[in-house]
């Protein structure tokens, strides 16, 4: 049995980084939106970007580590525009923006980046601040950054942002803005031109989705899934594993599914995310014990689905989850599908029809988000009440809930601090709550999808077995 790789980790320093200029008095109170209120304060999402030592500096005394002061100064400039991130949370209603600052760790990793990354189960938690790894540790800073410096000159930058104030799109915008500011500062750009104007956020979520008084009280918050801080216990046997779906396999499945699509969806080719989501659903369907029904909750970015659409740089949580499921007794029983399935159908065709049905249902639920205003309001109401994510039974059948979040097409592999593009970008899946959760991200080529899956140990073994069987079958 392979031994778990463990690098010696030494925390060199911890600092507080504040905005370069004070936040104006009229911006000192940043109101949360209704959607912000629905996310837990303790849940931080760590994004890790790996940058190898470049050829130009790998043989000399200068390397990425010499840029630490530049990283800090550019981060300070970036916080001027992302000022709520440097504030402190008050009573699930607003952020006190008196420039309290974010936490910044400088860490030395004894070993080479290539050795660290070559492990079958990469120990990503070693690159995170301890206060992020443990959900039960109280935190004040809404953003925690750790710069990990390897002996070889490579660097892994970990940015952890509280989900209370930011979704995946906002987290991506923040890191891209910081990198752009660093790169421009390195080349001698003027202070006024340091930040890419296209990456300056807009703050309109609270006006679009006003906060709820109900969600400021303990009783109101208790209705929201994940609102209570999870305990760190030795009994928690949740494990995480990385799965990579390459472009060739995704394309093969997509072409087979396209033939089956109903007429009203023919013009909409399945996306990579839809294909992989359907494969995940089918695998958990096979892994789910008899008498239970798996329900998949998929995060949906509202920005482009609003009327009129919002900017990509709109700050905050502008995402909801939509829920999709297919009871085993009704899978592949629609009239359209019955015409093509008969007693001689191969098992692979049956599975493809099931994937087709699931994608059709998921699209139908997502279409409600971008439909009329009333439909969108109902989706948001269900999300804010915790109804969708806390489903217990459907038609008297016990439900097992699964959550999927996609970071695809967010430009994470384009993030350049002046060292070139990262060789790997990933999300640490081990932050609680993580049981039955999936994180999707692009592979480096931009065509495949990397998935981090988290299950209890026994469930992981079942999921892995069934996923491999399905991929081999179709």
Swiss-Prot record:
GO terms for biological process: alkaloid metabolic process. Belongs to the plant acyltransferase family. The lineage of its organism: Eukaryota, Viridiplantae, Streptophyta, Embryophyta, Tracheophyta. Residues 213-234 are annotated as: Disordered. Disruption phenotype: Accumulation of upstream metabolites, such as salutaridine, but reduced production of morphine. Acetyltransferase involved in biosynthesis of morphinan-type benzylisoquinoline and opiate alkaloids natural products. Catalyzes the conversion of the phenanthrene alkaloid salutaridinol to salutaridinol-7-O-acetate, the immediate precursor of thebaine along the morphine biosynthetic pathway. Conversion of 7-O-acetylsalutaridinol into thebaine is spontaneous. The active site is at residues 163, 416. InterPro entries: CAT-like_dom_sf (IPR023213). The gene is SALAT. It comes from the Eukaryota. This is Salutaridinol 7-O-acetyltransferase. It comes from Papaver somniferum (Opium poppy). Optimum pH is 7-9. Residues 214-230 have a biased composition (Polar residues). Pathway: Alkaloid biosynthesis; morphine biosynthesis. Keywords: Acyltransferase, Alkaloid metabolism, Transferase. The keyword Metal-binding does not apply. Its EC number is 2.3.1.150. It catalyses: (7S)-salutaridinol + acetyl-CoA = (7S)-O-acetylsalutaridinol + CoA. Optimum temperature is 47 degrees Celsius. One of its GO terms (molecular function) is salutaridinol 7-O-acetyltransferase activity. The keyword Flavoprotein does not apply. Expressed in root, stem, leaf and capsule of the mature plant. Restricted to sieve elements of the phloem adjacent or proximal to laticifers.
């Amino acid at each position: 049995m392979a031994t778990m790789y463990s690098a010696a980790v030494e925390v060199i320093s911890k600092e507080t980084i504040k905005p370069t200029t004070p936040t104006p008095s009229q911006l000192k109170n940043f109101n949360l939106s209704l959607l912000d209120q629905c996310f837990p304060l303790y849940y931080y999402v760590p994004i890790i970007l790996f940058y190898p030592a470049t050829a130009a500096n790998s043989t000399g005394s200068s390397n990425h580590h010499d840029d630490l002061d530049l990283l800090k100064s550019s981060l300070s400039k970036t916080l001027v525009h992302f000022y709520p991130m440097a504030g402190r949370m008050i009573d699930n209603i607003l952020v006190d923006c008196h420039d309290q600052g974010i936490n910044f760790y400088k860490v030395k990793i004894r070993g080479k980046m290539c050795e660290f990354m070559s492990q079958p189960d990469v120990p990503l938690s070693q690159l995170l601040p301890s206060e992020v790894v443990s959900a039960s540790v109280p935190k004040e800073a809404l953003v925690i950054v750790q710069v990990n410096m390897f002996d070889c000159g490579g660097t892994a930058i970990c940015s952890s942002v509280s989900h209370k104030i930011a979704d995946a799109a906002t987290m991506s915008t923040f890191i891209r803005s910081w990198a752009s500011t660093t790169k421009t500062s390195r080349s001698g750009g003027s202070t006024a031109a340091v930040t890419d104007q296209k990456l300056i956020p807009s703050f309109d979520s609270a006006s679009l989705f006003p906060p709820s008084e109900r969600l400021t009280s303990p009783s109101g918050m208790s209705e929201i899934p994940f609102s209570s801080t999870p305990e760190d216990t030795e009994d928690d046997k949740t494990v995480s594993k990385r799965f990579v779906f390459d472009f060739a396999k995704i394309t093969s499945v997509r072409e087979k599914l396209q033939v089956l699509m109903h007429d009203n969806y023919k013009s909409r080719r399945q996306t990579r995310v839809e294909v992989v989501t359907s494969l995940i659903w089918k695998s958990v369907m096979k892994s789910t014990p008899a008498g239970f029904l798996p329900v998949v909750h998929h995060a949906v970015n509202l920005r482009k689905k609003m009327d009129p659409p919002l900017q990509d740089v709109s700050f905050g949580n502008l995402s909801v989850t939509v829920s999709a499921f297919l009871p085993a007794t009704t899978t592949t029983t629609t009239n359209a599908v019955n015409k093509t399935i008969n007693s001689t159908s191969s098992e692979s065709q049956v599975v493809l029809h099931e994937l087709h049905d699931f994608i059709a249902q998921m699209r139908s639920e997502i279409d409600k988000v971008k439909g009329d205003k009333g439909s969108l309001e109902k989706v948001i109401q269900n999300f804010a009440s915790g109804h969708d994510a806390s489903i217990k039974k459907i038609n008297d059948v016990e439900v097992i809930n699964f959550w999927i979040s996609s970071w695809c097409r967010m430009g994470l592999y384009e993030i350049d601090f002046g060292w070139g593009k990262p060789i790997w970008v990933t999300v640490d899946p081990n932050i609680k709550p993580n049981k039955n959760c999936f994180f999707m991200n692009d592979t480096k080529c931009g065509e495949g999808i990397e998935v981090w899956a988290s299950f209890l140990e026994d469930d992981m073994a079942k999921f892995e077995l069934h996923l491999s069987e399905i991929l081999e079958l179709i």
